[in-house]
């Protein structure tokens, strides 16, 4: 029996070396884009249109769309709100279409679109995501959004958590050092995750802008079974 591959790409800059058009690609940007996207669907958003540039987001705004947009953590002046999961309240997003542009996450989503299916992953939907991947029995590639093409810890830790769950199914295997390393990192951190996360660079960036109130929430596991999936130009739930 040929095992399905579980691979982890720790930076978008490395994606061309991992690209697999037959794989399910899971995009994760734990702090904060993927957590915000999952939260938006938990709170009833109809669809999210991820765009790579602020120019695209602004053009949608001029057409009357609600826009969430940030760069370096800060809300852009034309946007309705930014990138915190707490921005995506039921009162604000239920039944709506939202255009979304972020520093790292939305570009990673577009990059991943060459895969057979693109899913959005966060701790909030971790087990549901792992169960779906095991059910589908396809190769899986976890794409970490990172920070401006650089490695980051928080996304890699999540990749390890997801990979470990998927590999519990003996139809899957991995000889990918990105996978093995991310699992080792996750297991080193898991007993004191918040203590570990307090060291990461993004924690400092968020604290600098008084945006660190979401860090604990973004590491809560299994608050939902919803899995956002990319369908051409927009995200909806499976």
What are these regions (language model features)?
Residues 102-103, 122, 144-146:
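Short, structured patches in soluble enzyme cores that scaffold and shape functional sites
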Residues 132-140:
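Glycine-rich phosphate/diphosphate-binding loops that line cofactor/substrate pockets in enzymes
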Residues 80-117, 131, 153-238:
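Long, charged alpha-helical interface segments
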Residues 145-155:
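Phosphate/ribose-phosphate-bearing ligand recognition and processing surfaces
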Residues 140-147, 170, 174:
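Glycine-rich anion-binding loop/nest that anchors nucleotide
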Residues 1-4, 8-21, 26-30:
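Non-transmembrane, aqueous-exposed alpha-helical and coiled segments at domain scale
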Residues 6-7, 23-26, 46-49, 64-68, ...:
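Structural motif
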Residues 8-16, 33-45, 51, 55-98, ...:
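Residues that scaffold, gate, or flank divalent-cation-dependent active/transport sites
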């Amino acid at each position: 029996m040929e095992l399905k591959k579980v691979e982890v790409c720790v930076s978008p800059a490395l994606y061309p070396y991992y690209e697999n058009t037959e794989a399910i690609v899971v995009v994760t940007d734990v702090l904060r884009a993927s957590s915000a996207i999952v939260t938006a669907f938990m709170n009833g958003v109809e669809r999210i249109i991820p765009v790579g540039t602020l120019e695209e987001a602004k053009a949608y705004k001029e057409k009357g769309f609600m826009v969430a947009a940030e760069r370096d953590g800060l809300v852009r002046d034309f946007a309705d709100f930014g990138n915190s999961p707490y921005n995506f309240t039921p009162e604000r997003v239920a039944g709506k279409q939202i255009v979304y542009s972020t520093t790292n996450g939305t570009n990673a989503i577009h990059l991943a679109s060459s895969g057979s299916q693109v899913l959005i992953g966060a701790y909030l939907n971790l087990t549901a995501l792992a169960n779906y991947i095991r059910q589908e029995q396809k190769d899986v590639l976890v794409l970490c959004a990172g920070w401006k093409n650089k490695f980051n810890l928080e996304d890699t830790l999540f990749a390890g958590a997801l990979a470990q769950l998927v590999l519990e199914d003996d139809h899957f295997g991995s000889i990918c050092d990105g996978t093995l390393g991310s699992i080792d990192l996750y297991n080193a951190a898991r007993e004191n995750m918040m203590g570990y996360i307090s060291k990461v660079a993004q924690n400092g960036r968020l604290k600098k802008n008084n945006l660190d109130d979401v860090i604990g929430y973004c590491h809560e596991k299994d608050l939902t079974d919803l899995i956002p999936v990319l369908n051409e130009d927009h995200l909806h739930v499976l």
